Amino acid sequence: MALLDFFLSRKKTTANIAKERLQIIVAERRRGDSEPHYLPQLKRDILEVICKYVQIDPEMVTVQLEQKGDDISVLELNVTLPEAEETPK
């Protein structure tokens, strides 16, 4: 019966194949576009403000945006500050 099913089965149309491929491409792009376009500029602005008060290396600041559900986004900011210098009395 398997041989008969093989010859009688319908082959996928090119439209169905194209649709499946397009769905894969869209899913991959959605995964890659998780970072909003304004995030790099936001990081630069935050770094400028921090540098007004403390001298730090730009690599010491990380900014991440995390999706938690459909309507909740969490912005996480980590800043590694240098050790405080002691002021003479």
Swiss-Prot record:
This chain's protein is named Cell division topological specificity factor
Which keywords label this protein? Answer: Cell cycle, Cell division
Native organism is Pectobacterium carotovorum subsp. carotovorum (strain PC1)
Q: InterPro entries, from UniProt?
A: MinE (IPR005527), MinE_sf (IPR036707)
SUPFAM superfamilies per UniProt: Cell division protein MinE topological specificity domain (SSF55229)
Task: Describe the task this protein carries out.
Answer: Prevents the cell division inhibition by proteins MinC and MinD at internal division sites while permitting inhibition at polar sites. This ensures cell division at the proper site by restricting the formation of a division septum at the midpoint of the long axis of the cell.
Gene3D superfamilies (UniProt xref): Cell division topological specificity factor MinE
The family annotation for this protein states: Belongs to the MinE family.
Gene Ontology biological-process entries: cell division; regulation of division septum assembly
Q: Does the keyword Oxidoreductase apply?
A: no
